[in-house]
Design a protein with these regions (language model features):
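Bacterial N-terminal signal peptides
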Residues: 4-18
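Sec/Tat signal peptide C-region and signal peptidase I cleavage site
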Residues: 19-25
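Phosphate/dinucleotide-binding and metal-coordinating scaffold of catalytic cores
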Residues: 25-352
């Protein structure tokens, strides 16, 4: 599909699905996230010395962009994340890439300062499939609303400082949260540990909860952060200019989908206190106060089955077996979303 048609398709998808608060108009993304083409990169750094200590200093590295517009940029790298930074979970942890110099006006990284990079975790080919399914989850939510994180897939040659090759694997960059907020004409809520459900934008919260149910992700919270941390767990909150901890109409923006049943990573387990057998068992966790908005969104999303399935089918390098399983898993959700009786049953288990 040519770029023009892709852009037209994306615009049509937003106009149909971004039904919540249509007055919120989003700006376009920066160059890195203006295309879905797979980047070709080389990342050079002392990977054997990168510390997983949360207090460790970043290490210097070099990022090279291949293709028709090659460029070389100094960067600093640091380990990030919680579960995936643990050595027993990931041999290769997720990284934060910070640009040591401002990328030039013609750079694909123009306007970027620091980015999260989701890496392959383990050498096994299966882990590339888990990564691609998480990447797909981000793109599915992006198709539902511009109030979401953009992602960009890359084939990355990792090399040591002496030029010795380490490994070549797919990874993906996640849009900086401040760019998400700015792109949507909002302001980020900071320094707040907990909010009430009544402070959330009802349509945005319902959309969030239904989407997490669709991919069977339980590793999130819209109103509180982890112990000792700011709100929210695997979500960021944004609101109108001048937003405070007492504001209403807050929009939750989800991220980190590796614990989703759609991905089914081997290290993913249900959170404490949620009693399901495994992460593939769906559990609806939307608020009862948002049931009407959730039902409206379920009706809306059930009509978009084909366009959302097309996003899964477009994901590069997914194995046929992986694609079929994911399609079947999402298909179960769409069958439920299209059944009034099943939707009614779903609303009965909402959070009060």
């Amino acid at each position: 599909m040519c770029l023009v048609l892709k852009m037209a398709f994306a615009a049509a998808t937003f106009s149909i699905l971004s039904w919540a608060n249509p007055v919120r108009a989003a700006d376009g993304p920066k160059p890195l996230f203006a295309s879905d083409d797979v980047l070709s990169l080389t990342l050079t750094a002392p990977f054997d010395t990168i510390s997983r200590d949360i207090a460790a200093k970043p290490v210097p590295g070099v990022l090279k962009v291949g293709g028709a517009a090659p460029e070389t940029m100094p960067v600093t790298l640091s380990v990030r994340g919680i579960t995936r930074r643990k050595k027993e979970v990931c041999a290769f942890p997720p990284l934060r890439v910070e640009f040591s110099q401002k990328p030039g006006p013609s750079s694909i990284f123009k306007g970027q300062k620091r980015l999260k990079l989701v890496t392959h975790c383990q050498r096994s080919a299966d882990y590339q499939q888990y990564l691609l399914l998480e990447y797909t989850a981000y793109r599915l939510y992006r198709a539902l609303t511009p109030e979401s994180f953009n992602v960009r897939l890359a084939k990355i040659d990792y090399t040591y400082k002496d030029g010795q090759a380490l490994i070549t694997r797919l990874g993906f960059f996640i849009e900086d949260v401040n760019d998400v907020v700015k792109r949507n004409g909002q302001e980020r809520l900071r320094g707040v540990r907990r909010i009430s459900a009544s402070q959330l934008d009802a349509a945005a919260a319902a959309r969030y909860a239904v989407f997490e149910y669709m991919i069977s992700n339980l590793d999130w919270a819209m109103t509180a952060g982890p112990a000792g941390a700011d709100c929210c767990h695997n979500a960021r909150l944004m609101g109108a200019k001048g937003v405070t901890g007492a504001s209403t109409g807050l929009i939750p923006v989800p991220y980190d989908f590796d614990y989703a049943g759609l991905v089914n990573a081997p290290y993913a387990v249900p959170p404490d206190g949620i009693h399901v057998a495994n992460v593939k068992v769906r559990r609806y966790r939307g608020f009862c106060a948002h049931n009407e908005e959730a039902k409206a969104f379920l009706t809306q999303i059930s009509t978009r089955r084909d366009s959302l399935m097309a996003i899964l089918n477009e994901t590069p390098q997914l194995e046929d077996r992986t694609r079929r399983k994911a399609a079947g898993y999402l298909g179960d959700f769409f069958e439920e979303a299209g059944s009034p009786s099943k939707v009614a049953d779903l609303m009965k288990v909402c959070l009060r």
